[in-house]
Amino acid sequence: MPSVYGDRLTTFEDSEKESEYGYVRKVSGPVVVADGMGGAAMYELVRVGHDNLIGEIIRLEGDSATIQVYEETAGLMVNDPVLRTHKPLSVELGPGILGNIFDGIQRPLKTIAKRSGDVYIPRGVSVPALDKDTLWEFQPKKIGEGDLLTGGDLYATVFENSLMQHHVALPPDAMGKITYVAPAGQYSLKDTVLELEFQGVKKQFTMLQTWPVRTPRPVASKLAADTPLLTGQRVLDALFPSVLGGTCAIPGAFGCGKTVISQALSKYSNSDTVVYVGCGERGNEMAEVLMDFPQLTMTLPDGREESVMKRTTLVANTSNMPVAAREASIYTGITIAEYFRDMGYNVSMMADSTSRWAEALREISGRLAEMPADSGYPAYLAARLASFYERAGKVKCLGGPERNGSVTIVGAVSPPGGDFSDPVTSATLSIVQVFWGLDKKLAQRKHFPSVNWLISYSKYSTALESFYEKFDSDFIDIRTKAREVLQREDDLNEIVQLVGKDALAETDKITLETAKLLREDYLAQNAFTPYDKFCPFYKSVWMMRNIIHFYNLANQAVERGAGMDGQKISYTLIKHRLGDLFYRLVSQKFEDPAEGEDVLVGKFKKLHDDLTSGFRNLEDETR
């Protein structure tokens, strides 16, 4: 069995020159200072000590370099060797990423567990990120010798799994005339499948490419995002929508359901592929994802059921893993997401949680003796967050054929004590366009998703108006009315506490009842039931339409009844006479989308018509 430790010798390889080494001068937790590093570059990858620990240079002063080590540094000694690799921290991109689980620096955890037989990652482990021996079905596109290719051109397709086609692209920095292209067949990641000639120099390419994680992958141009990210959560899709290529933040205290929302997005959103980064969260949560996702299925347009895991990549960096690797895990995840974006896919990246990432920055900053800013975080916290979120967006991809792709970033934030004035939360909110604020009080009342509809917002509502107009021309007005009802309820609550509900006007009683319908039977959603774990957008629209239709009809009936000589129409009378319709309004959420869109829309339309006729009959009876 091959060793996971690589060449753990007391000295490095004989082929290395002594000038390639530096020597450890100081060790402080994950931070190591090495001398004799003249000529090294910022963010260069190095191997530290006799165990070949992976590290990255984060500061250069003269010939000394400060290195953050991505593994446990216990046992390192002064004068241990530091080997330069002359390349930045990079990820391997190619077939085999989907369905895999990596740590923060893209080491495959399943392979390491199999080879080492241990539940923990051994120090200095050296395992390639992608399996180089697996054979993949390679199908070149209609290209031949003599054709010209430039960076980003798609030249072949690989069958990755029954859910995803993997398009093989030329690296962004390559170009030339084709001198060889492999015929269709099965190849491994070590086999040459393409050869290009440029200015008399020939270069071979495999299906694998590497890319430095801190460098955004180039695009042809950025585009305005105008397609909604449909999550299957009514409160998000209807009231606070995001777009494919948007940036979202989910701040909330512990136990508010951030992880459940992130996982629901991974399971049910209309993205083509999902990169889920567990950054500094509990190991049990990642274990839950690993157990749940392979069992979850999604129904494709042709009726096939496929495992959600086939479109998911997991980057697990749990809270007991080295702190420095948390920072790398975010960049590893976004680089993998950009790779799939460049194929023309819509990618969602979940970062759970960016607060842990910021804490890693704070710890490293403290070790470097940098001047602390608010709450001890480094002064460059906002700049780092911005550079990460800026990698989201809808783009026109580099190369041909012409295609658009997008990366949507959803970042969970865990402010201590649920305090939204925390530096990480406030810096995040100044960058992102969608704010899904979770409320501890709602969570304690078992109202999930616990998104507070009074403080949350989305800046994409205007960009999505054309989509809503095509989908349903009434929806924007209905949504505005629903928001007004919820806001009005908040205003009335203070009056109710002072004088009681009976003292209110009839229209205000109707407002409170409608708001209760919206809160308990529309915004609340049970993620663990077959009928409510995912709500298609047409169901969200029709449910809201019927609730607001009831609100409008009830108000009209009360106003008309006030001017008549007969029996006055009151809220109590409406509730008594139309109790069965009211029950059907409450029961809308129990309609199962598995019955099909036509069946459900038929039921919702019938309820809409029955509401109209029910109120008409009530008015006729009371005249």
Swiss-Prot record:
CDD domains named among the record's database cross-references: ATP-synt_V_A-type_alpha_C, ATP-synt_V_A-type_alpha_N, V_A-ATPase_A
Record InterPro entries: ATP-synt_VA_C, ATP-synth_a_Xtn, ATP_synth_asu-like_sf, ATPase_a/bsu_AS, ATPase_F1/V1/A1_a/bsu_N, ATPase_F1/V1/A1_a/bsu_N_sf, ATPase_F1/V1/A1_a/bsu_nucl-bd, ATPase_F1/V1_b/a_C
Matches recorded under SUPFAM superfamilies: C-terminal domain of alpha and beta subunits of F1 ATP synthase, N-terminal domain of alpha and beta subunits of F1 ATP synthase, P-loop containing nucleoside triphosphate hydrolases
Reactions catalysed: ATP + H2O + 4 H(+)(in) = ADP + phosphate + 5 H(+)(out)
One GO-annotated biological process of the protein: ATP metabolic process
EC number: 7.1.2.2
Disulfide bond positions: none
EC top class, as a word: translocase
UniProt-annotated binding residues for ATP: G252, A253, F254, G255, C256, G257, K258, T259
GO molecular function: ATP binding; ATP hydrolysis activity; proton-transporting ATPase activity, rotational mechanism
One Pfam family this sequence matches: ATP-synt_ab_Xtn
Keywords: ATP-binding, Hydrogen ion transport, Ion transport, Nucleotide-binding, Translocase, Transport
A GO CC term assigned to this protein in UniProt: plant-type vacuole
Subunit structure: V-ATPase is a heteromultimeric enzyme composed of a peripheral catalytic V1 complex (main components: subunits A, B, C, D, E, and F) attached to an integral membrane V0 proton pore complex (main component: the proteolipid protein).
General function of this protein: Catalytic subunit of the peripheral V1 complex of vacuolar ATPase. V-ATPase vacuolar ATPase is responsible for acidifying a variety of intracellular compartments in eukaryotic cells.
PANTHER family named among the record's database cross-references: H(+)-TRANSPORTING TWO-SECTOR ATPASE, V-TYPE PROTON ATPASE CATALYTIC SUBUNIT A
Protein's recorded name: V-type proton ATPase catalytic subunit A
Originating species: Daucus carota
